[in-house]
Amino acid sequence: PTPGDENIADLVAARTVHFDSIIARAIDHVDQFVLMGAGYDTRAYGELARSGVTFYEVDQAAVQNHKRAMIEAANIRCEHVNFVPVDFGIDNFLSKLEQAGFDPSRKTLFLWEGVSLYLSAEQVAATLAMVKQRAAPTSVLIADLYADRLIQTLGKAHANQKVLEMTNETLDFSLPFTNNWRQVLSNFVESHSM
C-alpha cells in the first residue's frame, strides 16, 4: 500500500512476515515452541512440523475444538502438536502447559502474537512475569504490542465491535507510542525485567 493508506490487514501481513523471519532464525536453537493464543495459526503444520521441536498451542477450548475439527477435515496431521486449553484472563497458562508435558527447563520459543491487545495491563504483566520466572533463561519471547491510538481506532469501528461482541472480548492493553515509541517500548520492557 501507499504510505498513509495502510490498514489492519496490511499490519497483520507485515507482522506475520516479520515474525516468521525471527522464528526461522530461532527454531533450530530451541526444544519447544509455545504458540500463546494460537487461534488459527498454522505454523506448526508446515515446514516447522519437521523441525523436531515439541509444539504447544495455547488458546481457549472452543477455538481449539473448532480448529482441530477443521484440521481433521483437511486431513492434516496434528499428532505432533499439544493442544492446551487456557483462558489467559483467568488461568495460569504455564501450569496448564506443564500439565500437558511442557518442560520449563528446556529452551523454548514463545510466540505471543495478536493477544496482548485483548488483555488488561495486569493480565499482560502477569503473563510476562510467568514467562520470566518459570521459563528457561535462554528462552525467547516474540510478542506484539499495540499503540493506544490503533486500539482506540479499532474499538470505534462498527465491524470490530460486532466481532468483539461475538467473541465476548474487549480491546484493552496498549502503549502510548505516539511520541518517542522506542523509549516507551524500552521502558515497558525494562519495567518487566525482560
What are these regions (language model features)?
Residues 1-34, 38, 42-194:
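Alpha-helical subdomain
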